[in-house]
Amino acid sequence: MLTPLQTYFPIAVALLVAVGLAAVMLALANVLGPRRPSEVKSTPFECGSLPVSPARERFSVKFYVVALLFIVFDIEAIFLYPWAVLLLPSDGYPGLGWAGYISMGIFVATLVAGLVYVWKKGVLDWAD
């Protein structure tokens, strides 16, 4: 029987190797890489075009609202995956049964009500 420390040891070794390799590559690039700064190298590169306006622009609040809505529905998807796996009985697990089905139905209904609300408020309308 493996102890918890023995179980996680390979993961810790892989993590240390990855961090060590990244540190070595960054150090080698810093030591061996050429340093010839110039004005051309210092200008921002935007698809081969010269920048025509400053990078600091104000965005409409709608972008942030849509980003928040995306995060909410992305989190919903994260909650739906384990629920879908655990809903039915399998491999000795009894399953969630009707209680799990009803609770997830309430959860999804709440999110759908929120979606209908923001839709009616015009948050998703980009016409103006």
UniProtKB/Swiss-Prot annotation:
Record GO cellular component, one term: plasma membrane
InterPro entries: NAD(P)H_OxRDtase_bac/plastid, NADH_UbQ/plastoQ_OxRdtase_su3, NDAH_ubi_oxred_su3_sf
Intracellular or extracellular location(s): Cell inner membrane
Any Pfam family matching the protein: Oxidored_q4
Catalysed reaction equations from the record: a quinone + NADH + 5 H(+)(in) = a quinol + NAD(+) + 4 H(+)(out)
Protein topology in the membrane: Multi-pass membrane protein
Major location (coarse): membrane
GO terms for MF: NADH dehydrogenase (ubiquinone) activity; NADH:ubiquinone reductase (non-electrogenic) activity; quinone binding
Domain of life of the organism encoding this protein: Bacteria
Keyword annotations: Cell inner membrane, Cell membrane, Membrane, NAD, Quinone, Translocase, Transmembrane, Transmembrane helix, Transport, Ubiquinone
Coiled-coil region: none
Entry's transmembrane regions: 9-29, 68-88, 96-116
Keyword Nuclease: no
UniProt-listed Enzyme Commission number(s): 7.1.1.-
Family affiliation: Belongs to the complex I subunit 3 family.
Function in brief: NDH-1 shuttles electrons from NADH, via FMN and iron-sulfur (Fe-S) centers, to quinones in the respiratory chain. The immediate electron acceptor for the enzyme in this species is believed to be ubiquinone. Couples the redox reaction to proton translocation (for every two electrons transferred, four hydrogen ions are translocated across the cytoplasmic membrane), and thus conserves the redox energy in a proton gradient.
Quaternary structure, from the entry: NDH-1 is composed of 14 different subunits. Subunits NuoA, H, J, K, L, M, N constitute the membrane sector of the complex.
Annotated protein name in UniProt: NADH-quinone oxidoreductase subunit A
Source species: Anaeromyxobacter sp. (strain Fw109-5)
Gene that this polypeptide is encoded by: nuoA
